Amino acid sequence: MIERLTDEDIIKTALARIAELIDAHGEWLYAQGASGSVCLRKSECDFRVSHRRLHFSCWTHQGLVIWRINGWEWTGEKLLLEASRRMGSEKARLELIPRASARAAAAAINDSRRERCYRLANLACAALRGAKVERASLSAGARSNQPGRYARILLRHLNRERIAVAGMVAGAGSHDTDAFLSSALIWFMRLRERSARPPYIRKLWLVVEKDYAEALAQTLALLREDLRHVITLLQLDDEWQELTPVRSPELEELWAQQPERFRRPPRDFMSESAEGIIALAPEAIDVVRARHGETLRYHGLAFARVRRLMDRESVWFGIEGARRRLLDETTQEEWSKLLRDLKEHRSAQAADQHHALYRASPEAWLEAELRRDITRLDPGLRLAPLHAQFRPTHVGSGSRPIDLLALRRDGRLVVIELKVSEDREHVLQGADYWRRTEIYRRHGHITRSRLFGDAPLSDEPPLVYLVAPLLRFHRSFAQLARAIAPQIEMYRFDINEDWRAGVRVMRRVTLTNNWH
C-alpha cells in the first residue's frame, strides 16, 4: 500500500528506508509509463530532501529527470513511487526494479497484461452478437524485451466485417491518452491498408477506463469526419465487467463548453537581481516570469530563481536536481563556478556534447532560441510579446503548457509545438493545444487578458506550427497528420539538425492542404 509523505518525520523515515533499499542492490531498472526503462547504478539514484519535500533524480535517455515523490511502496520486488513535477501538472507512477529480478518482473507484467487483453477481447466479443475473437495480442513494447501497454484485438462479425479493438492494459498517466490514440490510429490505418480480402476491417473500437474517457472523447472530435464515424469509444466499468458507449462531441460542440478558469500570465516586470544576472551573459540568459518570482535560464536550462519577500529580493541558484543555494557572500565561489560550467558546457561550441549540461532540457534550449528571434521560424510572426510555455489553466489541472503562443502580423494566433527527438504524439498534442487555445479565443479570454497588448486579434482559429529537426519527425507523422480535421490548419517546419548554433528553416509543408 502506498505510504503518503505528509509531514517531515514521515519523509525522513521514508528517505532512510529507501536509501537502505537502493544500497542493497548494485543496479536498478528505472521505468516510467510507456517511455521504456533505463538501467541505473545505485549511485545514480539520487534521493534527497529539499524544501521539506522528497525528490528523486536520475539521468535517462532524455536527460536529467527530477520528480517530487508524494508516496512510496516497497512490494518486495520493486519500489513504487507516486511522483509529480511541473508544479503538479505532470504526475506519474515510477518503478525502480532491482536488476536481478527485472527479468522475472517483466515476465509477470507480460502475463498480467496478456490476461487483461484476453478479458477485453471477451468483453468486446460479448458486446456484439455474432462476433468472434480472431486475434488478441499486445502491442509492441518500447523495447524488444518489454511487454506492450495496449491490447490489439480483431473481431470477426458474422463473416461480414472485422472490427479492430484497442484498449489500455497498463497503468496510464494523465497525459497518456495522446500516446494511446496515436498508437491505435497507426495500427488501425495500417490494418486497413493491408486488409486486401473480405471481410474488411472498417471499424475501430477504443476501450478505456472512466478516468480517460472524457479526455479521449474531446480529442476524437479533432479527427477528420470520415475517421470519427468509424471509431467507437467504449468505457470500462471499475470491475472490468461491462462496456458502455461514450459519445464523442462534434467539433462545433466544443465551443459551447464553458472553459476552465483562465490563468492570466504574470505582469511584465523584471527585478533588479534578474537584470543583473542577465547582464552577465545577455546572449544566453533569459527570464521566465511566474506569479511568485522569476526563473533565470541559460539557453533554456533553469539555473537561478529570484523571489521577492517583504520588499527584499533573494536569489537561489543550482541546476534542477542539485541542492539550491542562497546567493550571498558565502556562496559566491559556487555561483561563479556554476556560471563558468554553463558557459563552457552549455554552448553550441561545447567540446563535450555528452556532458550533462549540454544534454539537459533540449526542447527548452530550442524554445529559448526561438524566443530570442521568432522570425527565424516565420518572418510574419510578431517578435514580441511572445508567450513561452503558455498554460491557460491552473497548474494543477493536468493540462500541459503550450511551448510557444505567438501572434502573426495579420492578427492570427499561432500555436507552436516543438520537438527535438522523435515523438509519436507530436501531431495530436499540437491539435489538442489548438483546441484549448481556440476555446479561450472564442470566449474572449485572450483579448480581455491583453496577452498581446493592444494588437488586434483576427476572428479566425489559430494556426499550428509543428517544429522539429529535419531527421527527428516520427516515421508515422504523415499518417497521423492525415487523421486531423481540415479545420485545424497545420504546418510542418523542418529545421536544421545543428539548431543550437542558430535556427534555420530547411522546409515548410502545409499539412492541411496536402492531406485533405
Where are these regions (language model features)?
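Charged, terminal alpha-helix-loop-beta segments
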Residues: 1-516
